[in-house]
């Protein structure tokens, strides 16, 4: 089933829903980073979460960055997302490998660890970005983001994220949802939705059956007057460029850049999101120094 992200409401606007299938998106991300199965599941969940939360931004110039690091062998995962469904990310240790957990599944929680925080940074074009941070709840990422929404944004939420890794290490199914109760929503409705989520199969199981994201949400919210508002195609993409790397080098300051110049070596800089390589020889670094002097 093709990747798609949709926004919807249920029960006369009492519930806000964002759901997505992200199989192709996550496949591209793990191909870039050459992930192990556990690394793929961790990065894939974060990329899916990023695409969902990015779609909640209001302005096309807004960005959101989500970072989780609990001291585990994954060495942290970071994603940056945009309103139109584009997302990029990286994992500190893409080859992280742990035994299966007690449920016989990839141990994402163990790879992430629990001794740390999940941090959400929203750049909304204001003087300072919004930064929200909460302790890691489980390391499974979905639970941690639900805890973040409830504590930091005071919005009771359910977050479901799933990544099914195939035997050939490709992604067989990936997707997720964020379900939020709006102010004034019926508490019994929240309890019913919680019960419903506990009873249904996992989102990756539903995707594997060939269900579209519309069909999945119709299934979850059966009899709850689901209204689909809009849809976009989420995508793994990196916006790095020579100009951005130039600005990053200039930002380290004249003194430090001059020291690099005086060494006379060609420097190789690698984008952590897409592994694109940028080479700066003696002449190119000299050009940047001249720009800084003007």
Curated annotation (Swiss-Prot):
SUPFAM superfamilies: Hsp33 domain, HSP33 redox switch-like. Pfam families: HSP33. Coiled coil: none annotated. Belongs to the HSP33 family. One of its GO terms (molecular function) is unfolded protein binding. It comes from the Bacteria. Keywords: Chaperone, Cytoplasm, Disulfide bond, Redox-active center, Zinc. Its main location: cytoplasm. One of its GO terms (biological process) is protein refolding. This is 33 kDa chaperonin. CDD domains: Hsp33. It is found in: Cytoplasm. InterPro entries: Heat_shock_Hsp33, Heat_shock_Hsp33_C, Heat_shock_Hsp33_N. Redox regulated molecular chaperone. Protects both thermally unfolding and oxidatively damaged proteins from irreversible aggregation. Plays an important role in the bacterial defense system toward oxidative stress. Under oxidizing conditions two disulfide bonds are formed involving the reactive cysteines. Under reducing conditions zinc is bound to the reactive cysteines and the protein is inactive. It comes from Clostridium tetani (strain Massachusetts / E88). One of its GO terms (cellular component) is cytoplasm. Disulfide bonds join 238-240, 271-274.
């Amino acid at each position: 089933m093709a990747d798609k992200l949709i926004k919807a409401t249920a029960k006369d606007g009492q519930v806000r829903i964002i759901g997505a299938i992200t199989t192709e998106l996550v496949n591209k991300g793990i191909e870039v980073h050459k992930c192990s199965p556990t690394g793929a599941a961790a990065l894939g969940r974060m990329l899916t979460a990023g695409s969902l939360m990015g779609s909640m931004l209001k302005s096309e110039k807004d960005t959101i960055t989500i970072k989780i690091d609990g001291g585990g062998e994954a060495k942290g995962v970071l994603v940056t997302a945009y309103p139109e469904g584009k997302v990029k990310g990286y994992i500190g240790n893409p080859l992280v490998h742990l035994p299966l957990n007690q449920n016989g599944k990839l141990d994402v929680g163990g790879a992430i660890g629990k001794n740390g925080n999940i941090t959400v940074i929203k750049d909304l074009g204001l003087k300072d970005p919004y930064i929200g941070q909460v302790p890691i709840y489980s390391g499974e990422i979905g639970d941690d983001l639900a805890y973040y929404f409830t504590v930091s944004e005071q919005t009771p939420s359910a977050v479901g994220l799933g990544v099914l890794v195939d035997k050939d290490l490709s992604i067989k199914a990936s997707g997720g949802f964020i379900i939020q109760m709006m102010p004034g929503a019926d508490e019994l409705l929240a309890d019913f939705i919680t019960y419903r989520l506990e009873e249904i199969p996992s989102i990756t199981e539903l995707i594997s059956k060939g269900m579209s994201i519309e069909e999945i949400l119709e299934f979850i919210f059966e009899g709850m007057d689901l209204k689909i508002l809009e849809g976009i195609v989420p995508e793994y993409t990196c916006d790095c460029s020579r100009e951005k790397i130039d600005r990053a080098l200039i930002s380290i300051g004249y003194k430090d850049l001059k020291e690099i110049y005086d060494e006379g070596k060609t420097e190789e800089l690698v984008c952590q999101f897409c592994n694109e390589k940028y080479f700066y020889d003696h002449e190119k670094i000299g050009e940047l120094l001249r720009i800084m002097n003007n």
